[in-house]
């Protein structure tokens, strides 16, 4: 499917067999996504020695201000395209790794998950690094914006700022992932 033709639909809650790269308005299910990723890796005959998951959740405070809730917006066709780019970058950097990325949009309350990333690899180090790399690249290139609502006002948090093809940005993400 060409992501620029009418764009994909916002997906419902995660169900088994759903795309491993998704934008959804429904609650995220990290365990189900990780299990589906593991099944896909195993079905290809590849060994899976470790699965690492990252769950980003809405925190109660930001820079000393009490957060009431967040609203996420995304340019969905391009966000999914950026997830696919990240998936390709992970495959080049860690050939034995596979990833899944789901990001939520819409209104999220304190403690709700906004993003889940699962990374599977033949060894734990690669799974950790691929997972960390993916979240850093999402922050750099995915057109997803966060609108924070506080007790005393509201603010937009700057979204993606790096050029998708910026090697320096990719290197920063690799360096951060190496510390995972």
Name what the model sees in each region.
Residues 14-114, 129-132, 136-180:
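N-terminal, polar/charged subdomain of small-to-medium soluble alpha/beta proteins
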């Amino acid at each position: 499917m060409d992501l620029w033709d009418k764009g994909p639909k916002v997906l419902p809650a995660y169900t088994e067999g759903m795309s491993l790269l998704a934008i959804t308005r429904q609650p995220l299910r990290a365990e189900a996504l990780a299990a589906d990723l593991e099944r896909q890796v195993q079905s290809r005959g590849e060994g899976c020695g470790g699965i690492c998951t990252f769950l980003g959740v809405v925190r109660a405070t930001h820079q000393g201000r009490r957060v009431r809730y967040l609203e996420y917006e995304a340019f969905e066709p391009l966000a999914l395209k950026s997830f696919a780019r990240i998936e390709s970058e992970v495959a080049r950097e860690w050939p034995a790794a596979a990833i899944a990325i789901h990001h939520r949009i819409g209104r999220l309350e304190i403690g709700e998950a906004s993003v889940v990333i699962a990374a599977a690899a033949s060894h734990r180090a690669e799974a950790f690094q691929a997972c960390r790399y993916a979240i850093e690249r999402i922050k750099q290139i995915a057109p997803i914006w966060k609108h924070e609502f506080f007790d005393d006002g509201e603010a937009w948090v700057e979204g993606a700022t790096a050029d998708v093809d910026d090697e320096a940005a990719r290197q920063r993400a690799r360096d951060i992932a190496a510390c995972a």
